[in-house]
């Protein structure tokens, strides 16, 4: 095991989007471009050949697991996968003790769990960088991938408008952090009773956040339209109630037509065609969903590289 960075700098974590400065986000996105270009040219990029990633899953995953595991292997490292079923986490070991032990044996940890406070408790007792692979409150790796995908297809996101249609979940709160940091406007439209929590969002700067009761209005002129499932993990008991409440929040061709002519559509997946988005949209010409999914791999490689090696010359 090696020190957190080649510069022996302070220990850094990525638990929410605002843990990095705008300049650091820009650096990671630029490194993503370079790393992806190497990947497409089959050029090896193995700066983490002696590093080990521990992945801790307390929530099920497909894209998060595959992208982190493949990414670490592609950079020359190794991976240990832990779940509540095969570790002491499932037997009531305090997460602080788990952090103290795991972080003495690996170089970096990714956790996908429930409450944000849980990953914060882990990080506060870890000797190595910790990455949020998803919590109930935030999903920063996904938003990094989404922003990179927008830049890749349409250029800088500063000054643009992102329309979030659907549940005010971890994605929407992370989009808001990104908007505040990177200078774009976030339109949010949710059904009554599912709005952003005023206590959590505080008072965003003027022009950062606009909330709409009508999803069509939220899409008006948007450069990026995005959504997520109506029922997130942990809320399955509300599924039928949510289907009724969200019926008018299905992103369809009419909503995309209201957006900017060059607008793109994104979805963090898994998607339920006919619920939060129509098949026509997610499988249509404006959809960049599959590039978005692939880009989780590349941004997370850049993220791990940055947390372990610092900024490279």
Swiss-Prot record:
Catalytic activity entry: carbamoyl phosphate + L-ornithine = L-citrulline + phosphate + H(+)
SUPFAM superfamilies registered for this protein in UniProt: Aspartate/ornithine carbamoyltransferase
Main location: cytoplasm
PROSITE patterns noted in UniProt: CARBAMOYLTRANSFERASE
GO biological process terms on file: arginine biosynthetic process via ornithine; citrulline biosynthetic process; L-arginine biosynthetic process
Domain of life: Bacteria
InterPro entries (UniProt xref): Asp/Orn_carbamoyltranf_P-bd, Asp/Orn_carbamoylTrfase, Asp/Orn_carbamoylTrfase_sf, Asp_carbamoyltransf_Asp/Orn-bd, Orn/put_carbamltrans, OTCase_ArgI
Chain sites annotated for binding carbamoyl phosphate: 61-64, 88, 112, 139-142, 268-269, 296
Keywords linked to the UniProt accession: Amino-acid biosynthesis, Arginine biosynthesis, Cytoplasm, Transferase
EC number, as in UniProt: 2.1.3.3
GO cellular component annotations of the record: cytoplasm
Pathway it works in: Amino-acid biosynthesis; L-arginine biosynthesis; L-arginine from L-ornithine and carbamoyl phosphate: step 1/3
Binding annotation for L-ornithine: 170, 228, 232-233
Uppermost EC category: transferase
GO MF, one annotated term: ornithine carbamoyltransferase activity
Cellular location(s): Cytoplasm
Assigned protein family: Belongs to the aspartate/ornithine carbamoyltransferase superfamily. OTCase family.
Function: Reversibly catalyzes the transfer of the carbamoyl group from carbamoyl phosphate (CP) to the N(epsilon) atom of ornithine (ORN) to produce L-citrulline.
Name the UniProt record assigns to this protein: Ornithine carbamoyltransferase
